[in-house]
Amino acid sequence: MAWFLVQTVYNQEKYAAVRPRHREYLAKLAADGTLAVAGPFADDSGGAFLIQAADADALQEILDADPYVVEGALESFTVREFNPTLGAWVQ
C-alpha cells in the first residue's frame, strides 16, 4: 500500500452544493482506514487529503468515485505519492 497526498482546487460555483456528499464519501473512506486526514484550506480555495491505496490506478478509482469529481466541483487536483516518516500516527 502507498500513501498519496491529494490537493484540490474548487470550482467556486459548484463545490458548496456538493460538499455534503463529498464529506459523506470521505467519512466512509476514513472509517475503513483508507483516508488518514482531510480538510479544506483556510481560504476555502480547495483542500487536501492523505489517502492510502494499492497503487496509482487504485487511487484513481477512489478519486473517480468522489462526488466532487463526479459532479464537476473541482477545477483541478494534484496527486503526489507520500512517504510518512514521522508523526503521531506513523508506526
PLM regions and their residue ranges:
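Conserved, structured core segments of small domains
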Residues: 1-91
